[in-house]
Amino acid sequence: MSQQIYPVPAHAKEHSHLTPADYARMYAESVEQPEVFWAEQAKSLDWVKTPTKIKNTSFDAHHVSIKWFEDGELNVAYNCIDRHLAKRGHVTAFIWEGDDPHSHDIITYHRLHDEVAKIANGLRKLGVGKGDRVAIYMPMIPQAVYAMLACARIGAVHTVIFGGFSPNAIADRVNNCQAKVLITADEGLRAGKHIPLKDNVDTALAEHDCPSMEQVIVFKHTGSHVSWGKDDVWWHDLTDGCSTDCPPEVMNAEDPLFILYTSGSTGQPKGVVHTTGGYLLWASITHKYVFDYKPGDIYWCAADVGWVTGHSYIVYGPLANGATSVMFEGVPTYPDVRRIGQIVDKHKVNILYTAPTAIRALMAHGDFPTEGISGESLRLLGSVGEPINPEAWHWYYTTVGQSRCPIVDTWWQTETGAAMLTPLPSVTAMKPGAASHPFFGVQPALVDGQGNELSGATEGNLIITDSWPGQARTVYGDHERFVQTYFTTYPGTYCTGDGARRDEDDYFWITGRVDDVLNVSGHRLGTAEIESALVSHNAVAEAAVVGYPHDLKGQGIYVYLMPNEGVEITDELTKEVSNWVRKELSPIATPDLIQWSSGLPKTRSGKIMRRILRKIAANEYEQLGDTSTLADPSVVDTLIEQRLNR
């Protein structure tokens, strides 16, 4: 790991929100007197009823309960839109850049208000009300944000489904949360390719029983022909004549705001529930301090609203702070790898927040991504989704940031709501690849496999010892799964599932997942979900999926397969199985390497030893550790001999 230290640049200290002394004082108060600290921070939101009960939380596995501001009342959409109108209604909320470089739009806060009110009234016309679930399967267009905020305005609970997911994944999520309405578009656009969103929805509803689904709202984005059913309604028809006046529903701070599905290590995705008050405060306060955001900044989070980064740092955090954000439909490499730089120059972007995968994709082209690009407007860079390797950090810092922009390398999860470990641009000297220090209220610790806390410079399992306002409250419809997943491994603490090390300067470095969840290009994928898709193919008897180091994606997907008897292994079959996963689950889940084998390493009780498979996939087969419980050690020798990642 790099131990090179980059001091805080002088310009980052000027007019900043925090000095190192401010951070030390505020952090101490946030962990020593959380009720006092968070009551003060909550004043940054507009409340219908100011909360007096600030923190009521328990990590006891017999009674896991997380409540913040529980007697407070507010509306998220009001906080993100209405309260800005009097003084900032004319200010741009979103600069939208289409996949096609010639497509763009400007959405002011006034226009955002009117568009959200119309679709909110449209939803009310369809009978959607407080507590109803609405699925959103949209491209990266402003209407995706309008739909999310419309749900928040009327008290409906949204679940955004990433536009790259398959019909099966759509149906699973719709059925799990019993969504009443689904909002989609005719098609999406990505790198010039048309993504058949409406067709995917049609397939999901035709091939699966989705009894809760009553209506599908379709936004006309590309204008391509789509099939039509009796339960379909065009967005423009629904909103035509709808009023731009839509009184916001008064919500309790602990009412659910959204459900977002994240991969679990035991098969079915988990519907992580975030609530209204604590989440909004957490998203907004982290956006303000992590990015040192100030009015007038042009801020760009290059994520997708289908993931939590898009929820917190495209929609809720920036809008609560009255920010101006860039929203980008396309990919960093289309039409060519200078697209990011061109958008930065075109809109004079000051803050750029993207994923190591995107950084590595651009880095592969050397200096070309910045050829003809000024980049002089940039003052801050950010990284999210997975640990950034020092080589990519250096390229980002020198080539994109011109060796003058601090990098905030943030660690957090769907379940944490927003940033947890992060440098602060005016406070933290940077170490390439380090997530650095905890944000206000976050109390990290490292423990060994038995749960004993480790002190000093060490490596272990990362836990959080107390609650924070943006913490997920439960898994939708399955609180026991929430408890078992996060609170039983190391009782009395939140188990992140990540490993980390702490250096002699108390900087935290994330070392990767310790469970069976992969982090592919910043997207979390459950190995069990991929294995389930693989074994549903008629040629596959058994499957085991592990991650391995991948230059571009961070983690690649390495698949071990046992064929059914009589199946002939061919290149065509391998390609077919790969495409099968792509269709059943998502293009993101497409295997990088598929190794066929007559056997898998199993214990005598029949459990696959994935630890060994991970070592082989990573070419670390000389460090297999204890293999005494293997039923047939010769299987391992064969797998090593035939390994694909040489």
Swiss-Prot record:
Top EC class, one word: ligase
CDD domains: ACS (cd05966)
Post-translational modification, as annotated: Acetylated. Deacetylation by the SIR2-homolog deacetylase activates the enzyme.
Requisite cofactors: Mg(2+)
InterPro entries per the UniProt record, alphabetical: Ac_CoA_lig, ACAS_N, AMP-bd_C, AMP-bd_C_sf, AMP-binding_CS, AMP-dep_synth/lig_dom, ANL_N_sf
A UniProt-annotated Pfam family: ACAS_N
Protein name per its UniProtKB record: Acetyl-coenzyme A synthetase
Organism taxonomic ancestry: Bacteria, Pseudomonadati, Pseudomonadota, Gammaproteobacteria, Alteromonadales
